Regions:
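Alpha-helix C-terminal capping segments
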Residues: 137-148, 171-173, 191-197, 215-217, ...
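N-terminal Rossmann-like NAD(P)+-binding subdomain of aldehyde/semialdehyde dehydrogenases
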Residues: 1-118
Length: 424
């Protein structure tokens, strides 16, 4: 049963404690990366057989496999994918940054070019649920950014094939190449390249402890989006909120994983107790009730504060992945929210909307990193290059200042490179 605690009566350590993965996979992941780097496809296939219990002859999804998957996918679900994709494109298209040029001084031009990375790798977890939504959320921003090739890697099922709904989502989103591999071996393949998998410049997407550690270890060889931890939700609610709604929202994240975190922060003890009772009613109704039970009992908590301002202060300190703001006039509080991956406003906006259909991204910072990190966006798939042009006359006007600055730093070679062009 979820624990109720009164803010101010328990330690901050208890209030702000988070679930943390306890398994140490650093050495195991390093070995996987080394093998894939040295042996390419052969190593990826061996690890796929070892971890996923399936032999793969070809790491890439063929056109025939894609066609078969599309015929097996319910047309109504494909229509839902297309509707979700349209909303995701509409939102992320507003994120596109423009290059700029400044030439308001004679003989001087400075500017910035926004350039997409050449190739992006997208990781989509397999496991107990096919995450076709993650395909849309991670591939579409890359395509909007202008990435030339998007590689999608996801583990195969026991039949050696990718779930048809995942392939259908890949088709809708525009993935260019699909790799039947998961785990650290897939991250290594995209980071270093193999016979079948070209090297990516950026790798994005959530995953288990092996995937997270692999992304950490290959960072610097490639860029990554973030190192994602377990799923999180914090519901900030006043006493007028419907306890059944709040319990359902908490369970929507608790069912993800046994180490997922579901937290309610409220100014009403009465509501807290009603939500606790609702959780006990609703958990047995879930298909993934065993997972949700462990998550709620081990990592769930209800925090009761004196007022809504304190509720918001607690939310900012926790900096959750998902934050639901279940209060009257939620936009009055929006400016007070400083740290959250994604905020769901009002009493009729469950975070499931954001997971699938609303349009904003669902690949979000976890473990408090929302204090300094952002959701996945078009920005993750572009880089910026600056450029500078000076005529000889424009250089002459600044050469003395450049030289003085350089000499102050003890870099006389810098000074000379500016002055030599103005002599004679």
């Amino acid at each position: 049963m979820i624990r109720i605690m009164k803010y101010g009566e328990v330690s901050n350590e208890e209030i702000f404690a988070r679930s943390m993965p306890t398994v140490n996979v650093t050495d195991a992941v390093a070995e996987i990366i080394r093998n894939v780097r040295e042996r390419g496809d052969a190593a990826v296939k061996e690890y796929t057989e070892k971890f996923d219990k399936v032999k793969t002859e070809n790491l890439l999804v063929s056109p025939e496999e894609m066609t078969e998957a599309l015929t097996k996918t319910d047309p109504e679900f494909i229509a839902i994918l297309e509707k979700a994709a349209a909303n995701i494109r509409k939102f992320h298209s507003r994120q596109v940054r423009n290059s700029f040029i400044i030439n308001d001084e004679p003989g001087v031009v400075v500017g910035q070019k926004v350039i997409p990375v050449d190739r992006a790798g997208v990781y989509v977890p397999g496991g107990t649920a096919p995450l076709s939504s993650t395909v849309l959320m991670d591939v579409i921003p890359a395509k909007i950014a202008g990435v030339k090739e998007v590689i999608l890697a996801t583990p195969p099922g026991k039949d050696g094939k990718i779930d048809p709904s995942v392939l259908a989502a890949a088709k809708v989103a525009g993935a260019d190449r699909i790799v039947k591999a998961g785990g650290a071996q897939a991250i290594a393949a995209m980071a270093y390249g193999t016979e079948s998998v070209p090297k990516a410049d950026k790798i994005v997407g959530p995953g288990n402890a092996f995937v997270a550690e692999a992304k950490r270890q290959v960072y610097g060889v490639v860029s990554i989006d973030m190192i994602a931890g377990p799923s999180e939700i914090l519901v900030a609610a006043d006493g007028k909120s419907n306890p059944a709604y709040l319990a359902a929202d908490l369970l929507s994240q608790a069912e993800h994983d046994k180490v997922a975190s579901a937290v309610l922060v409220t100014d009403s003890m009465e509501l807290a107790e009603k939500v606790r009772d609702e959780l006990e009613k609703q958990i047995p109704q879930l298909e993934r009730s065993e997972i949700a039970r462990v998550s709620i009992d081990n990592n769930g908590k209800i925090i009761v504060a004196d007022d809504l301002k304190t509720v918001i202060d607690i939310a900012n300190e926790i900096a959750p992945e998902h934050l639901e703001l279940c209060v009257d006039n939620p936009f009055d509080w929006l400016d007070s929210i400083r740290h959250a991956g994604s905020v769901f406003m009002g009493r009729n906006c469950p975070d499931a909307l954001g997971d699938y259909m609303a349009g904003p991204n669902h690949t979000l910072p976890t473990q408090g990193t929302a204090k300094f990190s952002s959701p996945l966006s078009v920005d993750d798939f572009v880089k910026k290059t600056q450029y500078t042009y000076f005529t000889k006359e424009a250089l002459a006007a600044l050469a003395g200042d450049v030289a003085a600055f350089a000499r102050k730093e003890g870099l006389t070679g810098h000074a000379r490179s500016a002055l030599i062009r103005t002599e004679g």
